[in-house]
From Swiss-Prot:
The keyword Metal-binding applies. Belongs to the cation diffusion facilitator (CDF) transporter (TC 2.A.4) family. SLC30A subfamily. Residues 158-174 are annotated as: Required for zinc-binding. Residues 53-56, 119-135, 221-224 are vacuolar. This is Metal tolerance protein A1. The keyword Mitochondrion does not apply. Involved in sequestration of excess zinc in the cytoplasm into vacuoles to maintain zinc homeostasis. It holds the Pfam family Cation_efflux. InterPro entries: Cation_efflux, Cation_efflux_CTD_sf, Cation_efflux_TMD_sf, CDF/SLC30A. The chain crosses the membrane at residues 32-52, 57-77, 98-118, 136-156, 200-220, 225-245.
Amino acid sequence: MDSRRSKVCGETACGFSTSSSDAKKRAASMRKLCFVVVLCLLFMSIEVVCGIKANSLAILADAAHLLTDVGAFAISMLSLWASSWEANPRQSYGFFRIEILGTLVSIQLIWLLTGILVYEAVTRLVQETNDDVDGFFMVLVAAFGLVVNIIMIVVLGHDHGHGHDHGHSHDHGHSYGERAEQLLEKSKEIRNINVQGAYLHVLGDLIQSIGVMIGGGMIWYNPKWKVIDLICTLFFSVIVLGTTIKMLRSILEVLMESTPREIDARQLEKGLMEIEEVVDVHELHIWAITVGKALFSCHVKVRPEAGDEMVLNKVIDYIWREYRISHVTIQIER
């Protein structure tokens, strides 16, 4: 009969409590989102007025896109706030996946609005309206929008790659303090998914502003080329949709509990098999509760003479050192 023992992280929430470092990162993300919301509202008001005056669908499309951005940022802030709630017996993993759901809603808003704009542009192309489009106004507004979007991109993206996950104070049967510095240097660089979603929104606006500015310049040069306004709307709507694909893929991978892309499951299993006392590894599972928070579990068959505690420590040490996974559940089998 096999002798079996399990070992999980020593603290109650085990990687899902609201640590002080997580709270600081959430607060920083909230400040960034609040700032871009204010900028979006101000610039959106300007675009609505100027878009009507210039009779430019492209400008109005950008204004509508900004309105969606404001709603998306609000959802992101709500998600950040909710993710700070502590785990409880019913929600044992906490509320981190609210971030995933919030970002998913944000992406759906982009798709909905883009579909409406494409429909309006196609309608104008088919009907061949004779309304004039003010190219100068298009260039002026788009240039201002370009500056605003660059500011927002700098605010949202200046800390790209510095969102390390430092909240690891779990008792795994031995101390990691001696090499904490080296481990932190090797940590995966992951941004808050809500800030990343906002970043994609603003990037889409930036691309659209460039397109409107180029199209406006051509219409300003020759007013008969007003069809460019509609072509710009269609072309850049496709680009905006394209910016959401990568984020949507990450969301679906989390919801499907796929192995995170940054972790090679075969290589991890190979590393475990290289531990001297390990005979076999099976029932290996790696998934993420949200982007950047991975979980791991497996069954490890060991040699009869091997000590359970020693093997557990070696396995957990390897997973932590090489993959920075703090939430680990191991079952020892003989």
